[in-house]
Amino acid sequence: MKSLEEKTIAKEQIFSGKVIDLYVEDVELPNGKASKREIVKHPGAVAVLAVTDEGKIIMVKQFRKPLERTIVEIPAGKLEKGEEPEYTALRELEEETGYTAKKLTKITAFYTSPGFADEIVHVFLAEELSVLEEKRELDEDEFVEVMEVTLEDALKLVESREVYDAKTAYAIQYLQLKEALQAQK
């Protein structure tokens, strides 16, 4: 089978930020022709599908500047240097919601936009939740409203586009499928 790989000829970092770095790469395509690739480097992130013992999903409502709107999401955040995804998942759950989890299960990991970015999101299911005695502080630039919703209401939030991001829609549909499969047993 013919190779589909591109060979990097030159690489230039054109931006280094708090969250992302941006590179422009000159590449040789599989057919021998030259092209340029703009690549966003990201440390990765986690997302937490937190479900109470009563079956409610813990979600957060927050304004997202790139979208210029407020959306509803599952708790999520960026991996800090040297952090394991499990640690980040618990940290973000605690910071954003005031809950912690005794049981944390990795559901999946996926690349958000592999055509131009290397960001990977690790998605976890958090169960056996309890409220922290002392809530951890949010980042100074973070403002969220915590919500508890049923799966049915979460699906309505997806339909109404209040849930507008892939990680949250994925997590809600995962839970819907999980519950449907359990009901068949």
Swiss-Prot record:
GO terms of molecular function: ADP-ribose diphosphatase activity; metal ion binding
Enzyme Commission (EC) number: 3.6.1.13
Catalytic activity: ADP-D-ribose + H2O = D-ribose 5-phosphate + AMP + 2 H(+)
Domain Nudix hydrolase: 40-171
InterPro entries: Nudix_hydrolase, NUDIX_hydrolase-like_dom_sf, NUDIX_hydrolase_CS, NUDIX_hydrolase_dom
Top EC class of this enzyme: hydrolase
Database matches in PROSITE patterns: NUDIX, NUDIX_BOX
Residues spanned by motif Nudix box: 77-98
Highest taxon of the lineage: Bacteria
Entry binding sites for Mg(2+) 1: 76, 96
Gene Ontology cellular component terms for the protein in this record: cytosol
Annotated active site: 140
Binding site for Mg(2+) 3: 92, 96, 142
Cofactor(s) demanded: Mg(2+)
Pfam families to which the protein is assigned, alphabetical: NUDIX
Biological function: Acts on ADP-mannose and ADP-glucose as well as ADP-ribose. Prevents glycogen biosynthesis. The reaction catalyzed by this enzyme is a limiting step of the gluconeogenic process.
Name of the protein: ADP-ribose pyrophosphatase
Species whose genome carries this gene: Bacillus subtilis (strain 168)
